[in-house]
């Protein structure tokens, strides 16, 4: 299944998202990885009407929803969090909230998630189109003695089959 993401140059390079893709977004801290992943989640959900699950190991779902609202409404998230918005911005937020509330996006912000726990949760989903894992480095590895690099490698390898078995 080919899904354009609304990022023209990236779509041209990657041909969009395909069902069996495992895509890792990597960059230095505070470069917008989470915001980018949330945009991909919303765009995928809008385009496909399929469920999107976001496993966030760093931020709570309230913070994620705030970021999604600000992005969808095209308002500054810092101003949204502080409540210092213009009346016209509040109208944009209300419209964005209405739009986002119609989308089947689910959040799991449980700390210490493991790949088997994640797979068990995904098995209950019937119309799954995308899984986002924010901050994969915080996932727990089955091998408690592994270095962080080894643990992330093992987690990544064990995630690839998820696209074959859980995405529709």
Tell where the protein language model's regions lie, with residue ranges:
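Pre-Walker A adenine-sensing motif
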Residues: 8-16
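Conserved small/polar residues in nucleotide/adenosyl-binding loops
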Residues: 1-5, 165-168
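Cytosolic-facing regulatory segments adjacent to core modules
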Residues: 12, 35, 39, 43-127, ...
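Conserved glycine(s) of the Walker
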Residues: 32
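P-loop (Walker A) phosphate-binding loop of NTP-binding proteins
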Residues: 28
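Substrate-engagement module of ASCE P-loop NTPases
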Residues: 151-167
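Pre-Walker A (Motif I) flank of P-loop NTPase domains
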Residues: 19-23
